[in-house]
Amino acid sequence: MLRDPALELARCAMHGVAFVETIVDPADDGFGTFEALPGWLMEASADLRAMVAAEGAGEGAGGEERRALPPLPAVRIAAGVHPHNAKDLTDDLVAALGERLRDRRVSAVGEIGLDYHYDLSPRPVQREAFRAQIRLAKAAGLPVVLHMREAHDDGFAILAEEGFPEAGTLLHCFNLDGAEASRWVEAGCYIAFGGPLTFKRAEEVREAARIVPVNRLLTETDAPYMTPEPLRGTLCGPAHVVWTAAVLCEVLGADTPEARATLLAQLYANAEALLDRAPTPWQKEPSHA
C-alpha cells in the first residue's frame, strides 16, 4: 500500500523509528510482501546511505563522516484478512494463511475484526471470518491486531465468547473515548493510538489515552492513512509516528527530556513485547504444506 516501502524504511531509520509492523491481507494483496521484504531492506540500505551522505554534504566539508549510518528498523509481519474482504475468506485461504503464520517473521494475525461503517462484506460473514481467524491465532500462539469500526459491541462479544488470545490483543488505531477504551483495557488488551490522537477536535481520543495503563500503550500510523497533525492532508508514512508519539508525551504529561525518554522507552518495550517476540511452538513445527 505504500508507494515506496524501501524509501519509507530508510526514512524510519533517519528519524529513529526502530520497529515497524507491516500488514499483509492475503485476500487483497496475496503474500507478495513475504517475498519482497528482503529486497525492500536491501534497497532501504542504499537509500539510507544516500540520505546520510546528503545530510552530511549539507553540513559542509567532512559532514558526511560525522554521522554513523543509523540502523534500519526491525520489520515484522501481521497477516490476516481484513473485514472488508471477509467474503473472500475461503477454507483454502484459511489453510494458506495458517501455513504463512509459520514464517517466523510473522508476529500477529491482523488486521482482523468487524467494519460496520462500510459493510463491504455482509455482517454475518464478517463475524464468521473474525471467529475463524481468532481461532487460527490461538492455535498459532500469536496475538491479534483488531480493526473495529462502528462494531465494538459485537467485536467485544465475539472475543469474550471465543476467548481473548493469551498471546495478546491489540486494538488498532483507537479513535473513540475513554468509556470505550476502559472495557478493552480491563480485558487485558493493548491500545494503539495513531493520527487521530493529534487531531485538533479529538479531545475524547486524548482522554482515552490518559486512562490506558502505560504498559498497554502503543503508537502507530496506519500508513498510508490517518496522517497526524501538523501534516494532515499529506500521504502518511511509518516515520510519521514521531508526531503521534510527541503528542502522546504531551497528553501524558511527559514534559521533560527525561520523562519523554522514559515514556518512549516504555512504548517501544510494549511494542517489542507484543509484536517482536520469539517464534511460537507453532512456528517451530515443520510445515504441513
For every predicted segment, state its role:
Residues 1-289:
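Mid-domain alpha/beta scaffold segments of enzyme catalytic cores
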